[in-house]
A protein has these predicted regions:
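Intracellular loop-helix junctions on the cytosolic face of multi-pass helical membrane proteins
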Residues: 2-12, 147-148, 161-237, 251-264
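Helix-loop boundary and gating motifs at the non-cytosolic
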Residues: 8-68, 219, 223-238
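C-terminal ends and interior cores of transmembrane alpha-helices
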Residues: 93-112, 274-288
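Intracellular juxtamembrane helix-capping segments at the cytosolic ends
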Residues: 130-144, 306-321
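Glycine-rich segments within core transmembrane alpha-helices of 12-TM secondary carriers
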Residues: 145-168, 328-346
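Helix-turn-helix DNA-binding segment
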Residues: 397-457, 461-462, 472-480
Length: 480
């Protein structure tokens, strides 16, 4: 009982602080939610009956892989992607064109060959557009704090499931309208989210040299391949798209981060997908309630969980090293090829003529071996901390700033925008709000005393104050 009382006290405590984390969530919620709902309706769990010579989801995935590789290779020349509307326009145009092609393939009175060609074209355009959307989304999301990244991502994926639920009962005409409207809404909301960012927090066009955290990508590759081995056999309601299994994982993660952000142990979450996926594959041959359904949900939930954790690690590394997350997000998107490879391996085993029980045993053994190798080789938390500066694996590591710091930074950003301060003046205002004196500010920014005095004078003039004490009062700071 005392433990339960403490738990309830933690939930009641700091309601205003928790609400602060969700300020401005709506454009993010609808951006990723609409995009994921569109993918589900278009290819993951198609709402239209389409005739094609092969799996359209594979075409979609391969197109997404190709565009992700292109973005990763050209990241230095492309960033910041959201600075202009060009990349957003290409993404929206590709997804809308994909919808129109898929609708025509399913509804237009065309020869069978033409319908198949349109379906393949639609899937390819969809993969291209969605691949671009994911890197655009990652770039915008990287500008906010880690706790918000976690909350916004989980809430958005949960919203995607809700959108699919309401679209699934529509007739053909309304589904077609939804398939056209959803990608447009996603891009418009993404633009709104980007424009709401303070200028000082927006992505920099300068990309310093960096190396890729290949062990993290290798971890995701192993899980992607393992998931692909069973993707075709997953029970209804399971899958990496906007499914019930996704909703379960995202709801639990969101609630945990929202109510217990200071206690959330990302390190424990980091290890939990191994247990889920191994149990899922070992349950494949089982009968009854512990058979295909439970196995499918465990496998799907493990893959959804590892995807969130890997993304969070990449955001953390990008923030700490000061590099663009676009290249990391593009490589993550390209790893969808391992899902396709896993499906291909499963189909090859099926074509070999082996009994189903032997196939299940071989696949389960392969997955267990892969997961053991991953645990022995890839789970190097000390390396993540020492080489990449990762701290989120510690208990409470998800919270970078206290609620008071969040409020102070929001006030500084608001005042800087209202007073039209330059980026350098905004930096100085941030440090003043933190209570730092002149020598500390000069030391941190490597500027001369005269330069600091000139900038400070401009800040006072633009903000309509006469001295530091009045500026502190304007900022709501306790320190003069």
């Amino acid at each position: 009982m005392p433990a339960m009382g403490k738990l309830l006290a933690d939930i009641r405590k700091g309601r205003e602080d928790r609400a602060l984390y969700l300020a401005g969530i709506l454009p993010y919620l609808f951006a990723l939610g609409c995009a994921r709902a569109w993918v589900t309706l278009a290819v993951a769990a198609p709402a239209l009956r389409l005739a094609a010579p092969f799996d359209l989801h594979d075409v979609f995935d391969c197109a997404m892989v190709l565009i992700s590789i292109a973005v990763a290779l050209a990241a230095r020349r492309l960033v910041p992607l959201n600075a202009t509307g060009a990349v957003r326009a290409v993404s929206a145009g590709a997804m809308v064109a994909a919808s129109l092609a898929l609708i025509a393939a399913g509804a237009a009175p065309l020869p069978e060959g033409a319908q198949a060609a349109l379906a393949v074209l639609g899937a390819a355009l969809g993969g291209l557009g969605f691949g671009l959307f994911l890197v655009l989304w990652a770039e915008v999301l990287s500008c906010i704090s880690l706790i918000r990244i976690f909350l916004y991502t989980t809430a958005s994926q949960l919203a995607g499931v809700v959108f699919v639920f309401f679209c699934s009962g529509l007739d053909g005409l309304r589904v077609a309208c939804a398939m056209v409207v959803l990608p447009v809404a996603a891009i418009l909301c993404l633009r709104m989210a980007f424009r709401a960012l303070p200028v000082a927090d927006r992505p920099s066009p300068v990309v310093p040299k960096f190396t890729y955290p290949w062990k993290i990508f290798a971890l995701l590759a192993l899980f992607s391949f393992a998931y692909g081995l069973r993707q075709h056999q997953l029970a209804a309601g399971a899958g990496m798209h906007s499914s019930l299994s996704t909703a379960i994982v995202m709801a639990v993660l969101f609630a945990g981060a929202y109510f217990f952000s200071s206690r959330l142990n990302i390190g424990a979450l980091y290890r939990s997908p191994f247990v889920l996926i191994v149990c899922g594959f070992l349950l494949v041959p089982s009968e009854g309630v512990f058979g295909a359904a439970v196995s499918s949900y465990l496998i799907s939930m493990s893959y959804s969980l590892v995807g969130i954790i890997v993304a969070l690690l990449l955001y953390d590394i990008a923030k700490r090293l000061g590099v663009t997350v676009v290249a990391f997000a593009a490589v993550k998107g390209a790893e969808q090829i391992f899902v396709v490879g896993g499906k291909g391996a499963s189909e090859a085993l099926g074509a070999a003529g082996l009994p189903a029980s032997m196939q299940d045993a071989l696949i389960a053994g392969l997955v267990v071996a892969m997961m053991v190798a991953a645990m022995l080789i890839l789970l190097s938390e000390k390396e993540l901390a020492s080489r990449w500066g990762v701290r989120i694996l510690d208990v409470g590591g998800l919270v970078e700033k206290t609620p008071d710091e969040e409020r102070r930074e929001a006030r500084v950003a608001e005042l800087a925008e209202h007073a039209r301060l330059t980026p350098r003046e905004t930096e100085i205002l941030h440090l003043i709000a933190q209570g730092k004196n002149g020598p500390a500010i000069r030391s941190e920014l490597f500027i001369a005393e005269g330069t600091l005095k000139a900038h400070t004078s401009h800040i006072y003039e633009k903000c309509g104050v006469a001295n530091r004490r009045e500026l502190a009062a304007l900022l709501g700071s306790a320190r003069p």
